[in-house]
Each structure stands twice: as C-alpha cells, then as structure tokens.
Amino acid sequence: MGLCFSSAAKSSGHNRSSRNPHPHPPLTVVKSRPPRSPCSFMAVTIQKDHRTQPRRNATAKKTPTRHTPPHGKVREKVISNNGRRHGETIPYGKRVDFGYAKDFDHRYTIGKLLGHGQFGYTYVATDKKTGDRVAVKKIDKAKMTIPIAVEDVKREVKILQALTGHENVVRFYNAFEDKNSVYIVMELCEGGELLDRILARKDSRYSERDAAVVVRQMLKVAAECHLRGLVHRDMKPENFLFKSTEEDSPLKATDFGLSDFIKPGKKFHDIVGSAYYVAPEVLKRRSGPESDVWSIGVISYILLCGRRPFWDKTEDGIFKEVLKNKPDFRRKPWPTISNSAKDFVKKLLVKDPRARLTAAQALSHPWVREGGDASEIPIDISVLNNMRQFVKFSRLKQFALRALATTLDEEELADLRDQFDAIDVDKNGVISLEEMRQALAKDHPWKLKDARVAEILQAIDSNTDGFVDFGEFVAAALHVNQLEEHDSEKWQQRSRAAFEKFDIDGDGFITAEELRMHTGLKGSIEPLLEEADIDNDGKISLQEFRRLLRTASIKSRNVRSPPGYLISRKV
C-alpha cells in the first residue's frame, strides 16, 4: 500500500539539522490525507492553528496518511476507489452482506453532522430507547468498489470489538447496515483532539506531570494492541480524543483504519503512517509493533518541548531526518527538563526496533510510572515471545543468558520485575506451570498447547524444582539488544562479568574444561564450545562470548547440545 503526505512545507517542527538553518514557526499541522478505505474517510484538508480553528467535539475517523520513503522515491500503485471493474454495474460493497444488524433506523435517530469525507459522514445520534448520545460513522457502500474496501471495514469493526472495554479506547457499541450504508456506532467523545489541547497550551507544551499522564494512556493502548497481535500503525495526536472537556478527562484512541494483525516474528512490508511520526523501520519496509512505540516517542517529545524531533521543508527531507539523524536534546527547553524524561524519550526514539523499549516496558519507566500503579502494567508480548524463543536456544546460549542475568541490578530489572509480578498471580515469588499456562495460552496471536507450555517452563527452570523464580525468568525474558543500546559502558561491564563466571582461571578465555565445570554437563563438550568458537582456536574469547549473547537464534547454526546433560547448580 502506498502513502502520500500533506505538504511538509506547511508544517513546522524543531530545527536541528545544519541543512535546516531557519527557525521554525510555532507548532501547526496540515492534514491532507487521501483515504485508504471507507474506515478512514475524513479526507478534508484542515489547517490546524489554535488561534483560528475550533476543537473537534466527537469521535470521527480521520483519513490516515500514506507516504513514500526517500530512497528511490518509489510510489506503489493505489487503486482508485472510484474505479470499477470492466462491465461491473453494481459497486462491490452493495453486493455484499456484512452480516451486521439491519435495524439502525429503528434504534437510533441521526443528529448533527460532525465530519465528512470521501466515503461517508460522522454524526451525533441518539438511542431512541435510552436517550444516550453516540457517534455514528455512516459509510457509503457505493464507495466500496473493490473487495479490499469491504475487508477494511470488517477488519476495523473486528478490531473495535476486540479492544472495547479498554479504558483508553473509544467504545464500540454495534455495527449496522442497510442496502446503501454501513453504520458503526461508537462512544461519543466531546473533549476534542489531543492535538488541539497541545496547540492551546502556552508554547504548545505540557508540564512533565501532565505529559506523563497523557503518554501513560497512549502506552496502555499500544501494549493492549500488541498483546492481541495488533499494530495501530498510525499513532499521532489527531487520533486521540478526550472523553470530555474536563482537564482530567481520559484519553481515547480512535481511527484504527490502518491497524492490522500480525503474527510474532513477522513484519509488515508496506509503508503506512503519518510523516512526522513514522518509524525508521517502516520506511525500510520491515516494521512491527515497535513502530507504535516510536510514534509515541515522537508525541512525547512534542508534548515536552512543543517541537517535532524530525523536521524538514519536504516530506522526503523528513524521512531522511528520521533515518539518519537523532533528536536534539540540547536546545531550550530541554536543559530544564528532567533527566528521567529525557531518558524515557531517548529510549523510545532508538532507531533499532530491537533495542527500543516495548510499550509495556515503557510503562515501567520511572518517569511514566510515577503516580501510576504496577498492577496497571499489562503483560508484555515481547517477554512472552522471548520465553518462547528461549527453549529454542542451545544449552550454551541458555547458560550464557543465565550468567548475564545475575549481573544486572534492580534498576535495570525494574520492567522485568513488573512482568514477573503480572504473571505470578498468587504472589508467592515463583511462577507455576498453571500461571505459565495462563500467561502463554491466552487469546494471543498464537495459542500454545499445554505440552508446549510445559516444555518452555522446563527449559527456563534451571534448578528443576518445577517452578520459575525471578532469576530464571530474567534469563529467559532479557532484551539483550536493549542492554547494549541503552548503556554501552554498562553492557561492557555486565557481559564481561558474565564471561568471568565461565573463565575460572582468569586467562581471558573459556576452555572446554571450564565450560564443563561451570555447566555440569556430561558427555562431549566440544560441540557446545564450537558453537561460539568462531576462530576455531579451541576456546571462547570475550568477543565471541558477547557475540553468543547477541545472536538471535543459536540453533540455526545446527549445533546440537551434548547428550546426557545434568544441571549441577543454578547459575
């Protein structure tokens, strides 16, 4: 799917690059977004400026933007939604029964118009029975000229159904249809867009305390989506509405028109999103849930300083900034912003998605968590994925990770402590097979059979007592790439300390005998050593050990663990 953005020349941001020497105007936003599907139909061009524009006052879908990466300037085909197949007289959407209720007119009365676009309109409506006011998106079936347009509508309804009940997602009530239209009935949000509140603030900035409250709510949405195997793909201030005009009103995510489901380990290869918020890996056509976290990092940066972290006069220029440059944390007001806030934003704007904080990890960060409750932190899908991968690692890789886990301090383990506590339901300090089953066998994008869950617990349970304690959990759940990216000096220290647990004589190498002594493995140890011995000198150097820790999947090298192993002690 292709993307095309509104002209970046009309937008402003934070001047960082030497190629952009001119000061930026105040934060304003131009939205000009050709619609992707009937679910994303707000196609009007709006100049956002707090001096002249009224606030939005209801739940209304806005068309997500599509763009092209700077390299190659390749634009993908976009099928015209107004075109029809040769000989086709009835639009595809009018020939399809969506399976939705057919009694909309009997249940609701349409009121004032809230917004409109190429595919339809959004209205205030009233429930005839209860008198409750709702938002109704009316989508014209005649505009659904191709099957994918119908699938987009069905997918968005499915997503809204899945997320309904989350405190920070606009509530879905029902979907209806008649011969001409589809009606999506949702919660009415009358507090306006997050974007409008940013623009209304002095210098378009939030206080740190207020910004943290907003960011925490966005992260909760992202974490819930990711746990369900869903990526929002268009996180930006325009897609968050306040329930009411009250200052402490909850924030509600809306516009899931670009959202899609993804299986663990898979990537999206199309380019979707909005220029200022798009992640580097999206432009490289290899994106996943991490891209949502990047977008929240951009929003966090804007909330704190009133400027965009990546800016240029053209869209291609913005993309180059995103791919090559780092955000500026030196100019005002950053010197007056807390180190904790800066650390948080930096860890969300890491260009390598593997080293970026996950949404659930970010919720454990001290800057966001202050005033929050650990019980509010959801299970991190990446932690569950790491545990699933741990069983696939060779014995040597598992032992190395256990050694590394013992070198980390409480601050470094704060997010994993939250995750452990979330899985340890009975709070007895260990994870049982049943608790592991509850965490791994839920309605995730994948469901594991009981035998598979037992296999994972057995692999993590290094002392074979039938439970997983916190140390064992850390070894299996660690994000090694993050350790190195966030603090390279600490990474050097921690990885060396882990290496020295194997290097018993302190000569700077791990020999086969030292490997046997540390692991307690019986039988031939050479196959295990050869796995990490890149230069084939019969021993493992510190550099080779670090490479072992970084390697994604050691078993892909087809090295078999020695038979008859026996774990003599816990690492």
From Swiss-Prot:
Catalysed conversion reaction: L-seryl-[protein] + ATP = O-phospho-L-seryl-[protein] + ADP + H(+); L-threonyl-[protein] + ATP = O-phospho-L-threonyl-[protein] + ADP + H(+)
Biased composition (Basic residues): 63-72
Domain remarks in the Swiss-Prot or TrEMBL record: There are 3 contiguous domains conserved in the CDPK subfamily: a kinase domain, an autoinhibitory (junction) domain and a calmodulin-like domain. The autoinhibitory domain (374-404) inactivates kinase activity under calcium-free conditions.
Record's keyword annotation contains Phosphoprotein: yes
Record entry for activity regulation: Activated by calcium. Autophosphorylation may play an important role in the regulation of the kinase activity.
Listed name of the protein: Calcium-dependent protein kinase 16
Function: May play a role in signal transduction pathways that involve calcium as a second messenger.
Subcellular localization, as worded in the UniProt entry: Cell membrane; Nucleus
